């Protein structure tokens, strides 16, 4: 306990007036994270003032918006101006759209919004990728045509910084404009209300992607957090911290990164364990962030939809995408797949629409061939599953309707298909993908497994614990949540203090940025 008090005292000393400049200044190499001690101390102060303003609507909106902009500044520096520009642009476009009577005029406003939003996203995220492709094509043409000037073209990437969370808030603003166009929501009258929605800090930099029709009505309600909701929010924050700080960061730094940095130095069984480790790492990292975002929002009186639902328990690839990153998969379905025609244009067109949707979903994650192939893999898998479901009636039962033995087999097949995709997702190059697969299929050496258990005890234990927690029944998770929810406030405060202590302890080992910050 003395060690805990000393750590807290040390941290408070770091938050003295002498360090105030550091707190207010953006540091490129140290963006603010939910899993950082700094965020927790800032949030506690923010929450106290927030609750005192709960009956003052406009003041509360301005206060939260300013804190959200500060939070984004601490994550991306002066790119908060870009966030404000995108928000202002789409707010004005939605206002103009409602004053336009003709259908084609309204469509023109939607097109303008897409051009602005996707144009900015394309520049910051894909411009270098497109230049690299163009340089490669020019070089190949020069070789074929014997043109030395074309052959001598080399690719030099521009120094373009990717604003944190641009893919997430761009999708949010696009969905708002489209929903206004479709008549599903009325446009907001006040600019500050829309900026509040776009910049709301719990989900700003890595989701979940929140729909305007779900979020905006909650802005105008007086935030009332019951004891049960406070306990639920605290439970989600604690779960997210454990997933991220204890499991994801540890197995990443101590095993997974080593495997993917040099696959040929390890046997096939170690490479396979590295893939299993990354599957757990990315789940704990991203779902951990989502848990914290949902929990923090709940502590502020806002309820978000679940973003992850034990995805590795899925028995089919279709079920996986109903459980993994639910806010993105539902967004792709509602605003891309259905807009392409969905399943209304015939069987072949349905398969093509699935493939296009997942290809663009892969490209959304990153500008590289490996992400495109990852999206293509999932698109083909979804199309194949739909084909099987349509032509073989014995495969139609899903979920709890499946026979237990079939569900076990389905979970194993789906999990390993997803893991194969994670190799594409994690590898720095296609060469690394080839090396990992080569080691797994030609240099397996299963006897090395026991050496892994002995040599990486901490990694092995955390991987076992992580997968057990993931596959445990929902009732067990609800039971754990009930323990936290029903605990006295003093016990909950102790739990939060312990969580902060864990964050401070692990900070010395280097808290890693969330994986989805790069998207």
Features from the language model and the residues they span:
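Membrane-embedded transmembrane alpha-helical bundles that form the catalytic cores
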Residues: 2-518
């Amino acid at each position: 306990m003395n060690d805990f008090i000393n750590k807290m005292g040390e941290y408070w000393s770091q938050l003295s007036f002498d360090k105030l400049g550091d707190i207010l200044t953006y540091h490129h190499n140290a963006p603010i994270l939910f899993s950082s001690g700094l965020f927790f101390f800032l949030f506690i102060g923010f929450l106290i003032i927030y609750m005192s303003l709960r009956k003052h609507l406009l003041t509360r909106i301005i206060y939260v918006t300013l804190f959200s902009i500060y939070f984004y500044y601490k994550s991306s520096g002066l790119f908060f101006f870009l966030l404000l520009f995108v928000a202002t642009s789409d707010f004005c476009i939605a206002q103009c759209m409602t004053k336009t009577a003709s259908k084609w005029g309204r469509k023109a406003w939607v097109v303008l919004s897409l051009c602005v939003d996707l144009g900015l996203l394309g520049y910051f995220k894909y411009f270098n990728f497109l230049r690299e492709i163009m340089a490669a094509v020019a070089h190949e043409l020069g070789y074929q045509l014997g043109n030395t000037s074309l052959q001598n073209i080399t690719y030099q990437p521009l120094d373009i910084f990717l604003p944190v969370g641009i893919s997430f808030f761009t999708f949010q603003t696009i969905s708002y404009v489209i929903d206004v166009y479709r008549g599903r929501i009325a446009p907001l009258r006040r600019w500050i209300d829309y900026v509040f929605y776009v910049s709301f800090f719990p989900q700003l930099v890595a989701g979940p992607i929140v729909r305007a029709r779900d979020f905006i009505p909650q802005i105008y309600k007086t935030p009332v957090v019951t004891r049960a909701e406070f306990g639920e929010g605290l439970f989600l924050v604690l779960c997210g911290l454990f997933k991220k700080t204890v499991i994801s960061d540890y197995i990443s730094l101590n095993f997974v990164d080593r495997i993917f940095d040099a696959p040929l130095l390890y046997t096939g069984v170690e490479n396979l364990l590295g893939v299993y480790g990354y599957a757990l790492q990315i789940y704990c990292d991203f779902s951990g962030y989502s848990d914290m975002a949902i929990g923090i929002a709940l502590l502020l009186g806002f309820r978000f939809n679940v973003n992850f639902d034990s995805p590795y328990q899925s028995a089919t690839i279709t079920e996986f995408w109903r459980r993994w990153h639910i806010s993105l998969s539902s967004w792709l379905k509602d605003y891309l797949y259905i807009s392409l025609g969905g399943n209304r244009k015939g069987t072949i067109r349905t398969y093509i629409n699935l493939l296009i949707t997942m290809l663009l979903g892969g490209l959304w994650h990153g500008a590289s061939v490996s992400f495109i192939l990852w999206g293509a893999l999932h698109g083909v898998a979804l199309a194949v599953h739909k084909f099987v479901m349509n032509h073989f009636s014995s495969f139609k039962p899903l979920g709890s309707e499946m026979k237990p033995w079939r569900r076990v087999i389905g979970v194993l097949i789906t999990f390993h298909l997803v893991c194969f995709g994670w190799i594409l997702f994690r590898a720095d190059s296609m060469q690394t993908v080839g090396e990992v697969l080569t080691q797994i299929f030609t240099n397996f050496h299963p006897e090395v497994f026991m050496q892994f258990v002995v040599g990486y005890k901490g990694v092995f234990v955390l991987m076992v614990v992580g997968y057990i927690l993931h596959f445990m029944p929902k009732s067990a998770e609800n039971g754990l949540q009930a323990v936290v929810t029903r605990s006295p406030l003093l016990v909950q405060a102790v739990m939060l203090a312990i969580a902060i202590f864990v964050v401070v302890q692990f900070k010395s080992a280097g808290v890693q940025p969330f994986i989805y910050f790069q998207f």
